[in-house]
From Swiss-Prot:
Single annotated GO MF: homoserine kinase activity
Gene (UniProt): thrB
Top enzyme category: transferase
Name of this chain's protein: Homoserine kinase
Positions that bind ATP: 83-93
Organism expressing this protein natively: Thermotoga maritima (strain ATCC 43589 / DSM 3109 / JCM 10099 / NBRC 100826 / MSB8)
Domain of life from the UniProt record: Bacteria
Keyword terms, alphabetized: Amino-acid biosynthesis, ATP-binding, Cytoplasm, Kinase, Nucleotide-binding, Threonine biosynthesis, Transferase
Reactions catalysed according to its record: L-homoserine + ATP = O-phospho-L-homoserine + ADP + H(+)
Function: Catalyzes the ATP-dependent phosphorylation of L-homoserine to L-homoserine phosphate.
UniProt pathway annotation: Amino-acid biosynthesis; L-threonine biosynthesis; L-threonine from L-aspartate: step 4/5
Length: 281
C-alpha cells in the first residue's frame, strides 16, 4: 500500500496559524504489515537531511496511547521529496502518513476527521496538517479541542526559495513576542480579510497583494542571522509579493532573478494541490 502526502505552506503572511495551503510536491510512503519488526527506510532527494526516524515511531506510539489499539509491526519505505525543516510541512507529512498507516493496521476504525484531530494534537496547530489531509487552501479555527475549517479549491502556481540551512519550528515560536502593537494586529486583520475576500471572489492572483504581515515574520527573520541575510537578498529584487513559508526558512516570492541570493539551495515552482493526501492499494 502507498500513501502520498503533500507539502504544505502556512500563514501566507497575514494568516498566522490560520491559513494553510497544500502543494503538488509529495512524500511517497509505501508500507506493508507482512513483517515481524517495525522498520523505516528513507530514500529520495532530501533523505540525507533527516537526522532520524523518531517522529514516525512517536506518532505510532501516540496513536496507540490515544486509541487503545496496538499497531502491528510495519515495514515503511518513504521517498523524501519535501525539503526537511524548511517550512514546507515535512513534519506534518510524516504525522499524516504515520497516522494513516496506524489506522490501516488497526482496522480503519478512525475517520479522517478523527485522524485530523490527532494530527492537530501532535502538531500543536492545524494549518499544516489539515491541508495535508484535504488539499486546497484551508482556513483553520482551533479553540482548545474544537477544530473547524473551510477549504477553497484554487488554481495557483507559486515559487518557493529554499535555503541550505534548517530552522526548528519550536525555536522560531519562542522568538515571537507575547504582546504586539494594536496597529500591527489591525494591519494583519485587514490583510487576511482582504486576502480571503479576493479568494472568495475568484480573484486568486489579486489575493497575493494582501500577504503583508507584522505579527510574526520580522521577529523570526531578525532572530536568525542567516535567514535575515537570505530574506534581505530576496527583498532587494523588489518582489511584488513575498512571505515566509511556515516558520521558515523558505520564502515564497514571485522573483525570477536568483543571482546573488546567499544560502539558496533549491527553487521549487509548485502548483496548489486541491486533492490532498492520495491513497493507493
Amino acid at each position: 500500500m502507498k500513501v502520498l502526502v503533500p507539502a504544505t505552506t502556512t500563514n501566507l503572511g497575514a494568516g498566522f496559524d490560520v491559513f494553510g495551503l497544500a502543494l503538488d510536491l509529495f512524500n511517497e510512503v509505501e508500507f506493508s504489515f507482512d513483517t515481524k519488526e517495525t522498520t523505516i527506510e528513507s530514500t529520495g532527494k532530501y533523505a540525507s537531511d533527516l537526522k532520524d526516524h523518531n517522529l514516525f515511531f512517536e506518532v505510532l506510539r501516540f496513536f496507540e496511547r490515544k486509541t487503545g489499539y496496538r499497531v502491528p509491526p510495519v515495514r515503511i519505505k518513504q521517498t523524501c521529496n519535501i525539503p526537511v525543516s524548511s517550512g514546507l510541512g515535512s513534519s506534518a507529512a510524516v504525522i499524516v502518513a504515520a497516522l494513516h498507516i496506524a489506522n490501516e493496521g488497526t482496522g480503519r476504525n478512525l475517520s479522517r476527521e478523527d485522524l485530523m484531530k490527532l494530527a492537530v494534537e501532535l502538531e500543536g496547530h492545524p494549518d499544516n496538517v489539515v491541508p495535508a489531509f484535504t488539499g486546497g487552501l484551508v482556513v483553520c479555527y482551533q479553540n482548545g479541542s474544537h477544530l473547524d475549517f473551510e477549504k477553497f479549491e484554487i488554481d495557483l502556481s507559486l515559487t518557493f526559495l529554499v535555503p541550505n540551512f534548517p530552522v526548528c519550528t519550536n525555536e522560531m515560536r519562542k522568538i515571537l513576542p507575547e504582546k504586539v502593537p494594536f496597529e500591527d494586529a489591525v494591519f494583519n486583520i485587514k490583510n487576511s480579510c482582504q486576502f480571503l475576500a479576493k479568494i472568495a471572489a475568484g480573484k486568486i492572483k489579486e489575493a497575493l497583494k494582501y500577504v503583508g504581515d507584522r505579527l510574526h515574520q520580522n521577529y523570526r527573520i531578525n532572530g536568525n542571522k542567516k535567514m535575515k541575510e537570505f530574506v534581505e537578498a530576496i527583498l532587494s529584487k523588489n518582489p511584488e509579493y513575498w512571505f515566509v513559508s511556515g516558520s521558515g526558512p523558505s520564502v515564497c516570492s514571485n522573483i525570477n532573478d536568483f543571482e546573488g541570493i546567499p544560502y539558496l539551495k533549491d527553487v521549487l515552482k509548485l502548483r496548489v494541490n486541491n486533492r490532498g493526501m492520495i491513497v493507493s492499494e
